[in-house]
Amino acid sequence: MAKLHDKYQETVVAELTQKFGYTSVMQVPRIEKITLNMGVGEAVADKKVMEHAVRDMTAIAGQKPVVTVARKSVAGFKIREGYPIGCKVTLRGERMWEFLERLVDIAIPRIRDFRGLSAKAFDGRGNYAMGVREQIIFPEIDYDKIDKIRGMDIVITTSAKTDEEGRALLDAFNFPFKK
């Protein structure tokens, strides 16, 4: 079992119940899933780029990503409907907790010029979205084997009803928000 999951069950539930006055343990917000998305627009010109992106995402997430395709043709971007333009992976359960642990303890501290995560990136329903500019902050990525530095979006979906509850939940997991 991941350390963060144990921490959630042992201390976070009690803290949030006391802070927000929940009457049932089931009302306490929890992390439902983490979605990683990597847009790879260059894949239109070179098919090899997508293979590298999928390989990197597989190493980071621990499971094979789904290749996303263009929904409609856009002449300005030289893409047609059905062209592969990215990949995404949804983590739940044990893999989600392990990824969250690596993100908070290892990856975020390795971000260059890091001054804290923006607290304004909540969506109004307690979900948090963040962008990562370089995939090399993750220890699974070997710097010598990457073809190009790529970023990705990380969305943490919670069962929280408000941003305040979502922030309290992520604060309990030691997310480094700006003060």
UniProtKB/Swiss-Prot annotation:
Annotated HAMAP family: Ribosomal_uL5_B
SUPFAM superfamilies xref list: RL5-like (SSF55282)
Function as written in the Swiss-Prot or TrEMBL entry: This is one of the proteins that bind and probably mediate the attachment of the 5S RNA into the large ribosomal subunit, where it forms part of the central protuberance. In the 70S ribosome it contacts protein S13 of the 30S subunit (bridge B1b), connecting the 2 subunits; this bridge is implicated in subunit movement. Contacts the P site tRNA; the 5S rRNA and some of its associated proteins might help stabilize positioning of ribosome-bound tRNAs.
Keywords: Ribonucleoprotein, Ribosomal protein, RNA-binding, rRNA-binding, tRNA-binding
Pfam families noted in UniProt: Ribosomal_L5, Ribosomal_L5_C
Record's GO cellular component terms: cytosolic large ribosomal subunit
Database matches in InterPro entries: Ribosomal_uL5, Ribosomal_uL5_bac-type, Ribosomal_uL5_C, Ribosomal_uL5_CS, Ribosomal_uL5_dom_sf, Ribosomal_uL5_N
Cross-referenced Gene3D superfamilies: 3.30.1440.10
Keyword tRNA-binding: yes
GO BP, sorted A to Z: translation
Oligomer and partners: Part of the 50S ribosomal subunit; part of the 5S rRNA/L5/L18/L25 subcomplex. Contacts the 5S rRNA and the P site tRNA. Forms a bridge to the 30S subunit in the 70S ribosome.
Protein name: Large ribosomal subunit protein uL5
Family: Belongs to the universal ribosomal protein uL5 family.
Presence of keyword tRNA-binding: yes
One Gene Ontology term of the molecular function aspect: rRNA binding
Domain of life where this protein originates: Bacteria
